[in-house]
């Protein structure tokens, strides 16, 4: 029952996010299409937060020899992959709306696809191995590789941190509110995945 509650709260939070995104402040050059940029940015930041949290939980799991933390690492890694994969269609939608086309050779987009494929393969390996300590190692390695590669991926069409560089406090406030809602959704999804993993032991 508790596991189902977490899933329903996750789905409810997604609905709140969808509704909230409709009320984002317009921007001078992009108009109301900037609302896609808000959700697109908050979504991928949430994925990065999840991968980072999975790595931290993994490190702490190794240091403290904690099975519980290894399980959290697994759940956070899976939740992060959900946000990362679903970010891809959001990215395409944002491209089409704001750039009037799909620039599939954009380095940031190719990077996102590459790490989506790698993430899926690694999560499959985690499910096959069923070794909590290996799960944490994989999540630590994945996050390190992702962060290293992201820092070195060039930007062509993709602007560098458009929200943080904005002069509008209203835009920044709305974005971080939306990000908070996405992280809230991440929490419920991670909790559901953790409970599911514990039940399957």
Name each model-derived stretch.
Residues 1-201:
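Polytopic transmembrane helical bundles with strong interfacial aromatic enrichment
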